[in-house]
Every structure is written in C-alpha cells, then in structure tokens.
UniProtKB/Swiss-Prot annotation:
It comes from the Bacteria. HAMAP family: GatA. Pfam families: Amidase. The keyword Zinc-finger does not apply. This is Glutamyl-tRNA(Gln) amidotransferase subunit A. It comes from Cereibacter sphaeroides (strain ATCC 17025 / ATH 2.4.3).
Length: 491
C-alpha cells in the first residue's frame, strides 16, 4: 500500500509511531497528483508550501502536535488561501491571490495540516456536475466502459481527489448538497455540519444563509477528525455559533441501541430507481440490526423544497455576486473608446461569469425585483420556515436521525446533461436541499454499488448541533455496509 492510500486515522498513527514521515507522505500524494492529471481534480498545486509544512510537521512531532500534524489535504478553490490563487473556478477572479487566510484553512494549518493545492469545483459552487468550472470538468475516478463520469458538484474536485487517493482528505462546501452528492457519486464520506458550526469567513459566498463548509474523507472516522479541526466559534463570522465543539471521534462508540431512526415517506419519489429503493431498504435493515428502532415519519413540505431553494439561493447569489465588477480585483474587460463605467461592469460580468452563474444571477435579480419579491422570494422564505418546522416536530417526537437516499441515481456521464433542461440538473439535489434550508447536519455514507459497478450512498440527517450523534450513526452504517471498494485505476 502506498502512503497516499492511508486514511487520516492510519496516517496519524503511523506518523506518531515514527513509521512514516510527513515529508514522505506528502511526496506520495504529490506523486499521485502528478499521475492523476487526467482527473483534473487539482487546479493550483502548491508543492513548495506542502513540503515546507511537512518538514515543520516532522520537526514538531511529539511536542503536543496538532490533531492533523503532517496530514496532506486538498482545499476547495472556494476557500481563500493567502498568496495562493483562489478563483472559485471563475474567470472573473482570474489571478486573484488573497492577502488573508480563511478561518477554516487557518484552523487546519494550526492543527498541523499540509496543503497540497486547490481543488476543482463548479463556478462559484453553482452546479451539480463540476461542468461549470473555468478549469474544465473534474472527472470521476470511477468509470463505466470508456465513458467519463461526473464526480458530482459543486465539490467535484474534492470528491475525485479523495476517491482517487490523491490526498487524505479535502475541504468542501455545501449550499444544497455540494458535499453530500459528490461524496455519494465517488464512494466517499461527506458531512455538511449544522449551519454556524464552521466559520464561513474567507469562503467565497454563494448563498450566505445556506453555505456551510465541511470535510470530505475516506471514512467516517476521518470525517470526525477533520470536522473537529474545522469547527468552532469565529467572531469574524456573525452566523458562527459560540458553542463548544465536542470530541467527534470519541463519539464513534458504534452503539445506537434504542435510537430512533426516521424514514420520511415523502422521500419516496415517483419514478425512483429500484436500486435506490433497495439500497434504502438495506440501510434500514442494517440500522435495525444494530439495535435502532425504525420509525415511519412525515415531512409534509418536502415537495416544495426544491422550488423554494432555487428561489432563495439565486436571490442571495445575485446579491453576493454584485461585488464582482472589475474595479478592485479579478478580471476587467477591455473597454472601447467612449465606454463608461456601466459598460465596464456589463462587459466584465459578461466575459467573467459562465452561463450557469449568469442564469442564477438573472433568476435571483428577477425574484428580488419590486414586482415579484412577494410572489417568489417572500413565499419561498415562508416555505423554508415550514420545512424547518417539519424537522423540528419530528425531532421533538424523539427521532434521533433520519435516513434517506443521498442521490436519485449513481454518477452520470460528463456532457450527458448538456442539452437537458436546467431543471433536470437541479433535480440532483432533491434529497439534499431540505437539510440546507433547515440548517441541519447531514452526511453521505457509501453503502454499495449499483448494477453498473458505481457507488451509491445513503444520507443521514441529524438534530441541530448533534454532529457527534450523526457521525456515530454514520459509523454504524459504514461498518455494517462494509464498503471497501475503490475505483479501478485507469488514469
């Protein structure tokens, strides 16, 4: 086994025992990244920074080193990293190198982590297939025949890199499923924490009331380790919660006897593939066998979640993206003689933003306009409150976690949705958006393969601030499923 194939927990133990050096581990990852170029997962490599950090980790070993000392990670291009290109996969931020470090990356580096580079993603995190990136498509390491498959989105580069063992873990962000859907498509673990658990400061904003950063890893234990380093109060983020961060790894007891797992009847979508239905049933059985009580529940406003999300998220995006105007940073269009400032804004935004971003900014501006604010935006906000209330009632009745499918299908081919109605692409988020609208924690766990040999995941949704309990349920599901399959190396 090559060092880059280790889990975070295995590497941590090997480093602590002196069986492995952080420099050797980092070199193994850099070699794998080099060989993994066809996956287009990494878009900005930082080998000098990585090796400097690895050497510092080796020097620190043993003297109260951090929880991630010497662990090489990939960072999604949405996180601002000081002096390193941070473009949110958009041409409008071409060449942008922040003079500051996001809170999440600061915390990871303080814990001893090593940054290998920045990872591909959908432009401004808007997409479910990593096909809206200015860097080109990231490619799923899993393959059927000779078709290249999507790794999902928006955190597609993060998912591909972890699944292909290019790094030991990665950061992702999740606004409507952007950690959980790619994790399911690539056979890895991805958790979106409770809104406010992880600081958003220094992360390029998409929809500020929905965005949340989280870890993408090979195992649930690794997710617990990485989330512990990422989480915590940050005075620089007004939505960051000032509550203690528990020891998530210690919570993985494997004991869920007597816990109540809710199965929402509204998630049985019309036309749901039989494989997804069977996987969901298998998940219920595995949790019941572990001693949990399975309870049918109702979340009556689920059917309104997708339309409400696709009003609220673009509305917030259109406001957040107004700051990209070619004046202070990023791309500025070449102007003709006589062009004024309005021409500069228009040309810069037309050249800098991709089609999907333009579409969402247009939708957002429309639903926030005077004539439609009440008809669309305010109505969507009311629906959001009802969706949150559904979850509150279920948890008040004693449900500990909710089990649902993570995605409506396994990974689809790159380019397959190119001529589809945009709404068809949006349907990929059907099982995940409710979690963001309600601000809850959700995790995707790989549970099996479909008939084509592609990974499928199940989603567990937890009570607010109970990531510890959620991770323990996920750990039990992971152990019962025994998913150890890896993609066959073709790159």
């Amino acid at each position: 086994m090559n060092a880059n194939e280790l889990t975070i927990a295995e590497a941590r133990d090997a480093l602590a025992k002196g069986e492995l050096s952080a420099v050797d581990l980092t070199m193994a990852c850099l070699t794998a990244i080099d060989a993994g170029t066809p996956l287009n997962a990494f878009v900005h490599l930082t080998p000098e920074i990585a090796l400097d950090q690895a050497r510092a980790s080796d020097a620190r070993r043993g003297e109260g080193a951090g929880a991630l000392n010497g662990i090489p990670l990939g960072i999604k291009d949405l996180f601002c990293t000081r002096g390193v290109a941070s473009q949110a996969a958009s041409n409008i931020l071409k060449g942008f190198k922040p003079e500051y470090e996001s809170t999440v990356t600061s915390k990871l580096f303080a814990a001893g982590a090593v940054m290998l580079g920045k990872l591909n993603m959908d432009e401004f995190a808007m997409g479910s297939s990593n096909e809206t990136s200015c860097y080109g498509d990231a490619v799923n390491p899993w393959k059927v025949d000779d078709r290249k498959l999507t790794p999902g989105g928006s955190s597609g580069g993060s998912a591909a890199a972890v699944a292909a063992d290019l790094c030991l873990g990665a950061t992702g962000t999740d606004t409507g499923g952007s950690i959980r859907q790619p994790a399911a498509f690539t056979g890895i673990v991805g958790i979106k924490p409770t809104y406010g658990r992880v600081s958003r400061w220094g992360i390029v904003a998409f929809a500020s009331s929905l965005d949340q950063a989280g870890p993408m890893t090979k195992t649930v234990r690794d997710a617990a380790i990485l989330l512990g380093a990422m989480a915590g109060h940050d005075p620089k983020d007004s939505t960051s919660a000032d509550i203690p961060v528990p020891d998530f790894e210690a919570a993985l007891t494997g004991d869920i006897r007597g816990k109540k797992i809710g199965i929402p009847r509204e998630y049985r979508m019309e036309g749901m593939p039989a494989e997804i239905e069977a996987l969901w049933a298998k998940g219920r059985e595995m949790l019941a066998d572990a001693g949990a009580e399975i309870v049918d529940i109702s979340l009556p406003h689920t059917k309104y979640a997708l339309p409400a999300y696709y009003v609220i998220a673009p509305a917030e995006a259109s406001s957040n993206l107004a700051r990209y105007d070619g004046v202070r940073y990023g791309h500025r269009a070449k102007l003709g003689q006589g062009d004024g400032i309005v021409d500069m804004y228009e040309k810069t935004r037309a050249e800098g933003f991709g089609k999907e971003v333009q579409r969402r900014v247009m939708i957002g501006t429309y639903v926030l306009s005077a004539g439609f604010y009440d008809a669309y935006y305010n109505r969507a906000r009311k629906v959001r409150a009802l969706i949150k209330r559904d979850f509150d009632q279920v948890f008040a009745e004693g449900i500990d976690a909710i089990l649902t499918p993570a995605t409506p299908s396994s990974a689809f081919g790159l380019g397959e949705m190119a001529h589809a109605d945009p709404v068809e692409m949006y349907l990929n988020d059907v099982f995940t958006v409710t979690v963001n609208l309600a601000g809850l924690p959700g995790i995707s766990v790989p549970v099996g393969l479909d008939a084509k040999g592609l990974p499928l995941g199940l989603q567990l949704i937890g009570r607010p601030w109970d990531e510890a309990g959620l991770l323990n349920h996920a750990h039990v599901l992971e152990q019962a499923a025994g998913f150890v399959e890896k993609p066959r190396k073709w790159w």
